[in-house]
Amino acid sequence: MIGMFRTKENSGLKVFLFFFSLITCQFILGQLKNHSFSFFSTPNSNEISHSSIKPFLETYQMLYDTNRKSNVSTWKRKVFDESLLLVLEDQVRLTTDPLFNFLISPKKTTQGYLYSSNVRGFRITGDLTKKLSFETRFFENQFFYPDFLSQKAIERAENENTIDAIAFGIGRAKKFKEDGIDAGLANGYVSFSPAKGIIFQLGHGRHFFGDGYRSLLLSDYVPDYQYLSGQYHFFDGKLLYKHVHAKLYNLSRIPVSTTPEAMLVPKSFGFNQLSFQATPALSFSLFEGTVFKAYNPNSGTSTPHISYYFPLMGSHFLAIDSLSSNSTIYGVNSSYLITKSMKLFTQFAVRSANKIGAQFGIRNEFSIDNRKTISFLNLEYNYVPTAMYAVDSNNQFQQFSHMGHELAHPLGSGFSEWAIKGQINYGRLFCRIGNTFVKIDSPGNNQPFADQVFTSNDLIEAIDKSNLINLNNSIGFLINTATRMEFSIGHLSRSLDGVWDNYLFFSFRTYLKNDYFDQ
């Protein structure tokens, strides 16, 4: 079932985590709901503690106060600042909202369809006392992707004849009409706090590690996955520790099955994060993540290495073996506020002495409307060496991937990238900037473009470098702050070695997740 774990396999783990946290944690007050992933709609990001660990809990998010203007009428608050349905009763808070993304371009596909997105769904959130919160979302999606994305969506599924394509950020998909894609999406979580400063989550969602637009370790680009997490605060909130135990899937099916549609080949994914807020301006964090073997072609599904169940930083060293059966990556992240509005950040990802990725960035927040809204500009440089995440041919089921998506950067490895991202706000009007400039390995051995994560080590051959440019800029109007409902007009332009694709688009959407079409 989506979002659920088999109780038999994990009940002992849950009990251990519960008592472990009760014994070791010092307590501070914590809220329980996650802030939505949206790089362009996180106000005062520079003021958030432990900013490398995402999703943010409401404790650290500077939320928009929908009641700060007492002279605003009820209907205006409902239209512009509140959820469609809002229930407040003692310690209970419930909200319901429609979610959608209606995007259309005047340009047509080769079959005569307009490039478009047709996404419809809903969101329900709830706080039931201070100890229990939940959120659930459901979407139906039809896409007519730009040509470069459509080709990649089909290529990623070509090795499994029961799957037509992938939908980016969603997972497996079916063909829709001649050249469209249809996919469903359901996610959600339940948060429980047995004591102050301790939060457990059981859900179907995603995570992110880092301060930049990109992450070289773990990104929300990947589709939702089943997970169980624990989050603990020490020393008056200066230290934050989080561990996550997840179940991922390869985009290939188990060969022998008694059902018409066999189960996808599984793998287990565990990651530990430790963040230290040394001062209000200085933060350091560590990351340890491993894709554990959970399937053997000869014997079928198997139990992952015991260290998968340990919620302790450093325990994944125990999983390293001579056969590279488990794929481990380590990382460090740091950030420093030069001023209240300007932040420097770095990230390093390490697999071995000759496989080290690096990120350097700067983010500046400012206002052009007397602090009514916050604008920002983000400049970052990302470098990932060739075959950074690749595994050998004997361990293809332990790739750093989930449902045909890279776990970290959408371009995989073998590139250097400059990314310029930002948003200029004036009241509810905005100008959004999203441009990347990349030098990336040109594939050899007839391999697809930017596919190194899914290619075994011995087949990766970088014969030359290609120049990739993605330009995605828009202007628009923010309608509702609770759902980030907006209308925008913009363009998506992509150049690969001087060959351009250009798309004009009109969009009416609720912006609660990142798209990552710049690949």
Residue ranges of model-derived segments:
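Short regulatory "switch" loops immediately downstream of catalytic or recognition motifs
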Residues: 1-4, 248-250, 438-441
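Bacterial Sec-dependent N-terminal signal peptides
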Residues: 1-34
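Long, hydrophobic/aromatic-enriched structural stretches that serve as scaffold segments
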Residues: 4, 197-200, 328
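Outer-membrane beta-barrel channel domains
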Residues: 32-283, 290, 294, 360-383, ...
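Exposed, low-structure sequence patches enriched in small/polar residues
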Residues: 183, 277-278, 282-519
